[in-house]
Amino acid sequence: MSEYLFTSESVSEGHPDKVADQISDSILDAILAQDPNARVACETLCSTGLIVMSGEITTQANVDYMQVARAAVKRIGYNSSDIGFDYNTCAVLTAFNKQSPDIARGVNRTKEEEMDQGAGDQGLMFGYACDETPQLMPMPIYYAHRLMERQAELRKDGRLPWLRPDAKSQVSVRYLDGKPQRIETVVISTQHHPDISHTDLSEAIIEEVIKPVLPKKMLSGETRYLINPTGRFVVGGPMGDCGLTGRKIIVDSYGGTAHHGGGAFSGKDPSKVDRSAAYAGRYVAKNLVAAGIASRCEVQMAYAIGVARPVSLMVDTFGTGKIPDDKIVKLIERHFDLRPRGIIHGLDLLRPIYEKTAAYGHFGRDEPEFSWESTDKAAQLREEAGIEPAETEPLSLQA
């Protein structure tokens, strides 16, 4: 038997790196709403009283970048310098250029040629799914995200009025032979009003944030709760740390359970395969697991700039596949168009849907906009692979 602990973390929408991600994706959404074929690469830095946006944008859209950025910060809840940032008074600087013509010539195509649109860059991307949860996500990252969503909910609806936007979570799960057995440690660090005592804060976080989210059957008397372990977290947000787009790529994906190709998602239009191919990889892996072809599945794709078809495609089912991995590759090639334009069309990615992805994970969420979470190909894949419908359901997340 193999026994081990595995840990994943998440951060709140008010974490400075996530503030930057949300600003970048709010700019992307504002542009796509007017110009779906725009080319956008928006990078954001946020620090004390300052937002800086730069990158490459080629578009016919007319967007007030400063106003869009301020609105994103307002939605997060940074409305006073007392809590680390003020959307109304912060300075906002922009320095955008157009996309390089050397890149554009490999991506732009006529209407007749559009399905052969080349990848916007070289790179490797991974998709992953497993049957640990109904959402077919690894358990540690799934719960870490849900804890941060709960923190934001209680902050925004006023039930815990002393909460502030910046927060982090960490969940450690004990596994036996690859199956989650129990949650051993939960860490939450949350920014707070200076007048709340550590004792009151800890009790409220455990009772109001953690216990309503985590299933009772995964907790025990030995589960450790580490709440604000330093004892104080008043200075936070961009005042506490400089935030940058693309610095939370493991939080954004699978919490370290799966490989990562290194490319960030936020601020990039879907011609950038860092984003669109990672979404496609999740779509492929999730459908394979939903079909019962494997209980764990990781897909790797690689692209060359200006070339439409992936230069490589690899599947690893970690010994859980009902058919050989090389046959699964053939299934993928028959049922999924992994050219950039095929991905964009198949997943309907030219919509202004991206700000919502920029906090609480890009995967494993039941949001109608997240087309890559659909399992619409599972039945067909199952039939072609000759697999009987699964007799067991993934582990329940009901508390």
From Swiss-Prot:
The keyword DNA damage appears for this protein: no
Pfam families for this protein: S-AdoMet_synt_C, S-AdoMet_synt_M, S-AdoMet_synt_N
Organism domain of life: Bacteria
Region (Flexible loop): 99-109
Entry binding sites for L-methionine: E56, Q99, D241, K272
Binding of Mg(2+), residues: D17
Binding site for K(+): E43
Cofactor: Mg(2+); K(+)
Gene Ontology biological-process annotations: one-carbon metabolic process; S-adenosylmethionine biosynthetic process
Role according to the record: Catalyzes the formation of S-adenosylmethionine (AdoMet) from methionine and ATP. The overall synthetic reaction is composed of two sequential steps, AdoMet formation and the subsequent tripolyphosphate hydrolysis which occurs prior to release of AdoMet from the enzyme.
Quaternary structure and interacting proteins, as annotated: Homotetramer; dimer of dimers.
Alphabetical list of PANTHER family matching this protein: S-ADENOSYLMETHIONINE SYNTHETASE
NCBIfam families noted in UniProt: metK (TIGR01034)
HAMAP family registered for this protein in UniProt: S_AdoMet_synth1
Name of the protein described by the UniProt record: S-adenosylmethionine synthase
Gene from which this protein is expressed: metK
